[in-house]
Design a protein with these regions (language model features):
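C-terminal helical cap(s) of enzyme catalytic domains, especially alpha/beta-barrels
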Residues: 199, 230-248, 252-253
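Charged helix-capping and loop-helix junction motifs
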Residues: 123-129
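Acidic (Asp/Glu)-rich catalytic clusters
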Residues: 24-28, 49-62, 101-104
Length: 266
């Protein structure tokens, strides 16, 4: 079986005069982009410019929605009700959809950011709120998620799910990410990160902090653009995936290939 994977990164995470990461350089590596929608980062002009550039080069656009937390960059827990999570998700998808429409493209997926992304993996009420918002807005959208509650809630509503493998983050034995507040949560050795990514895609496993080879699905690899050496690392990961015989493809193609393979083996 030929392995295929999508490459995605979080883009448009500046605000006003401030920028974060080198989005233009990173776009050369990607097939998809999670674009900040103004709640943890991003503003109308940044959203407009980022969507326009993605449309120009054929990178799929996704809504990177978050808790309303500009000061904390969406990485702090907030005591929102599930219905607030639902309406905040709808609001942010709608905002990005407007820019996508203006530039002759559309939304392809959604991807919860930061603390919200962590919580929807373990909280059924938040997971159902996000999945319900997506289902009511556009049932063709792919939900990017780790294995967990959001993936389950989205599938229960008949939505397509893309499982995210995070290249530079440490995993616990239960499949959750080591919190950023803990030592070793973010990996920095480029060789180790590239090797882990290739294994994740070709072997379907990730080495945990406990030393286990944890089975994982991986439809898309999340590359971070806001860490030192991020562009060189992203290019190395892409290069080593290609060397390993992995096809880099848009997420819709990756999911279609896996669905066809499942049908063929049934």
């Amino acid at each position: 079986m030929t392995h295929a994977v999508d490459l995605v990164a979080d883009l448009g995470e500046g605000f006003g005069a401030y920028t974060m990461g080198d989005d233009e350089a990173l776009l050369d590596v990607l097939t998809s982009a999670n674009i900040a929608c103004g709640f943890h980062a991003g503003d109308p002009r940044i959203m407009d410019a980022t969507v326009r550039r993605c449309a120009e080069i054929g990178v799929a656009v996704g809504a990177h929605h978050s808790f309303p937390d500009l000061v904390g960059f969406g990485r702090r827990a907030m005591d929102l009700t599930p219905d607030e999570v639902r309406t905040d998700t709808l609001y942010q998808m709608g905002a990005l959809h407007a820019f996508a429409t203006a530039h002759g493209t559309g939304l392809r997926h959604i991807a919860p950011h930061g603390r919200l992304g962590n919580l929807v993996a373990t909280r059924p009420d938040y997971a159902e709120a996000v999945a319900g918002a997506v289902a009511s807005f556009d049932r063709s959208l792919i939900v990017l998620a780790q294995d967990g509650e959001l993936a389950d809630a989205a599938r229960a509503l008949g939505l397509r799910v893309g499982i995210v493998g995070i290249a530079d983050r440490a995993y616990r034995d239960d499949g959750t990410l080591v919190p950023r507040s803990e030592p070793g949560a973010v990996l920095h050795d480029a060789g180790e990160i590239a090797e882990r990514t290739v294994r994740m895609v070709t072997e379907g496993v990730i080495r945990t902090v406990g030393g286990r080879d944890l089975p994982v699905a991986c439809d898309t690899v999340l590359l971070h653009g806001d860490t030192p050496g991020a562009i060189a690392l992203a290019r190395r990961i892409r290069g080593e995936l290609l060397t390993a015989g992995v096809r880099i493809a848009p997420l819709t193609e990756v999911l279609d290939l896996k669905a066809d393979a499942t049908v063929g083996s049934a």
